[in-house]
Design a protein with these regions (language model features):
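Feature captures C-terminal
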Residues: 42, 46-184
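Glycine-rich phosphate/diphosphate-binding loops and the adjacent beta-loop-alpha structural elements
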Residues: 18-41
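Binuclear metal-dependent phosphoesterase catalytic core
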Residues: 1-21, 127-134, 139-145
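Generic alpha-helix detector with strongest preference for long hydrophobic helices that associate
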Residues: 3, 7, 29, 33, ...
């Protein structure tokens, strides 16, 4: 039908519209074809989480590795490229959280590290380390939702970007922070 064809053509024009360019390829896999985004930091994860943090003005942001669905080639970036990376209809959201909630969030997000896990966090505005020799002590309910950390934490050395100085400073567990992410 002509009406449907016209709608498809309009969406194709929008999708092919250039919105930026990159001199580097944004990766989801290594050169051997091993998926990285679910257990390693990648430039695609950094780019996406940095964009969320900057666009929302949040203190920090995250994109889970399971939500990064496609790489982006170097050169022109179009809406279709962004739709390929994020094919879901998720909305960007922000929330005020305590430093302790962030620590628990990170603990849950890396509970299966170094194994692949869609919850692996690509962060902006936060740095942290993981001691993978410590077994996870995260407890979840029957639906897989976080209940508590019942033992040693694997996550340590959590630092937050100070917007004024541009330096990373130790996280205050009692402090309040604005976190940006998706509402999936």
């Amino acid at each position: 039908d002509a009406y449907i064809t016209e709608i498809n053509e309009n969406y194709a024009q929008l999708g092919n519209r250039k919105i930026g360019e990159s001199k580097v390829e944004f990766i989801t896999h290594d050169k051997d074809g091993n998926r990285l985004v679910r257990n390693a930091e990648t430039n695609l994860g950094n780019f996406c989480s940095d964009a969320l943090r900057v666009m929302t003005g949040a203190d920090m942001s995250f994109v889970n590795g399971g939500g990064l669905r496609a790489p982006m080639e170097s050169g022109d970036i179009t809406f279709n490229d962004i739709f390929s990376v994020f094919p879901f209809n998720n909305q960007i959201v922000t929330a005020e959280i305590s430093g302790q909630i962030l620590i628990d969030f990170l603990e849950m997000a890396v509970m299966n590290y170094p194994e692949e896990d869609g919850s692996f966090p690509h962060m902006s505005g936060v740095t942290f380390s993981v001691n993978k020799s410590i077994p996870t002590s995260v407890k979840v309910d029957e639906n897989g939702f976080f209940e508590k950390v019942d033992g040693a934490y694997r996550v340590y050395n959590v630092k937050v970007l100070d917007k004024t100085s541009g330096e990373y400073k130790a996280l205050d567990p009692n402090g309040k922070y604005i976190l940006a992410g998706f509402n999936y």
